């Protein structure tokens, strides 16, 4: 019973505090930035030895450093939010074939999505010197920045699964309590 109650408490807390869970899945605001990463890599025709292309490593470094505990926690603090709830809103990925670093933010309002995106980009700019000195020389150019509103059936399904999970846990708790009560009655009858 204690484990089930613990799970119920966690599910209720998540439903209450999660920003992603409170977003209307039919009105998801998204802010996105696509950034182009260039390095000094050049193909040397006719040469057996080619200089290494660090683009993939640079993209991986940004992706890792923008989504690690320290980064997400610092951004979450700016918005008075717990790290685990901010982490649900922020997506960062790199594609070495296109040399793009993409940052995507989902939020309940356009203002929130844009503000969180600004914070992630500021964090990215603060990482430049570290990545430059440890991975390699590069430059970053903002190719596009967009804000949109969309429907997310995945989010709708996730929210429904969360509610269904809570209902299932509550039903399980009711069943356990009924079994406990029946056992108590049987013990009392046996004692008489």
Task: Label each region the model flagged.
Residues 1-20, 26-191:
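Soluble oligomerization/assembly scaffold segments of membrane-associated complexes
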